[in-house]
Amino acid sequence: MSPEIALNRISPMLSPFISSVVRNGKVGLDATNCLRITDLKSGCTSLTPGPNCDRFKLHIPYAGETLKWDIIFNAQYPELPPDFIFGEDAEFLPDPSALHNLASWNPSNPECLLLVVKELVQQYHQFQCGRLRESSRLMFEYQTLLEEPQYGENMEIYAGKKNNWTGEFSARFLLKLPVDFSNIPTYLLKDVNEDPGEDVALLSVSFEDTEATQVYPKLYLSPRIEHALGGSSALHIPAFPGGGCLIDYVPQVCHLLTNKVQYVIQGYHKRREYIAAFLSHFGTGVVEYDAEGFTKLTLLLMWKEFCFLVHIDLPLFFPRDQPTLTFQSVYHFTNSGQLYSQAQKNYPYSPRWDGNEMAKRAKAYFKTFVPQFQEAAFANGKL
């Protein structure tokens, strides 16, 4: 159900509270998922004119799970705070003295419900952390992370239900990784969606038993960061080592991700240097180039009255990854009506060269390759 449809069914006096929750409500580490409501119902009599819904189920993303809590207002007394039912978490009994925004409920503040939900989620986190005491191993993982503020202050924990047969229970740690994304080139962060939310990397580590014999890590990147780093398949994190612990594993993933970010930033500056060198060496031979991301360059060149184009595609992780050179005749066509072309990646190249050296080497390579390209164009293309 979309937020607008849901809000149209809410009692008008309660609508500001719920609007703040579904439109601006982001609780916890996963900033890419908003709070949402379902199962709208009314406690009013059938004679009460609508819209009159005053109770609903609130879906809250937490540690890779979705908490489903019932929130019950009374449309006849909209100035009163709501009641809460915590669904499957019947053992969760929040401390009323710590719910300051509930104790001092202010119906004139549209965000008062959202503030109470945030306080409840904080207490729910403490409730889940307390459940880890049933496992010395999982408690060790938690306490060692807690000693590091960069991890302990950005962590959610969900302890699964205990298995009645084995006495085991699973647990999931969700951590917001302290990786700086602020220097990623802005062109890579465009056009993902209208409201990309916070740029964030979350590491989920699931312990399927209390002795950590089955541990499954997974990395989640916010949409813009995933796009900037080359897509979901571009980053593979290592498996959790047998006998390892989170306080050693999490920094490894941070280091891997930081290096990936640095590759992207370095690639952007190196591509700009590369294209600047080609502009200097080839001058008026440059037809066009990508002036934002510096990922493409096209040259129009001549060799013994034979004109040809060279399209240069620079990869995201340049200079580690070699550019592709595509030679294209301006005279000859293939059977499908396309200009005859040949792509080349087997040419002299070193990622250690600067842009000027790459431009000089490319110019020398063009002179050696063009004769055979011209011959192939005449042999295989049609005028």
Swiss-Prot record:
Residues 30-147 are annotated as: UEV-like 1. It holds the Pfam family BRE. Keywords: Acetylation, Apoptosis, Cell cycle, Cell division, Chromatin regulator, Cytoplasm, DNA damage, DNA repair, Mitosis, Nucleus, Phosphoprotein, Repeat, Ubl conjugation pathway. One of its GO terms (biological process) is positive regulation of DNA repair. GO terms for cellular component: BRCA1-A complex; BRISC complex; cytoplasm; nuclear ubiquitin ligase complex; nucleus. The modification Phosphoserine is found at residue 2. The keyword Membrane does not apply. It is found in: Cytoplasm; Nucleus. Its main location: cytoplasm. InterPro entries: BRE (IPR010358). Residues 275-364 are annotated as: UEV-like 2. Belongs to the BABAM2 family. PANTHER family: BRISC AND BRCA1-A COMPLEX MEMBER 2. Contains 2 ubiquitin-conjugating enzyme family-like (UEV-like) regions. These regions lack the critical Cys residues required for ubiquitination but retain the ability to bind ubiquitin. This is BRISC and BRCA1-A complex member 2. It comes from Rattus norvegicus.
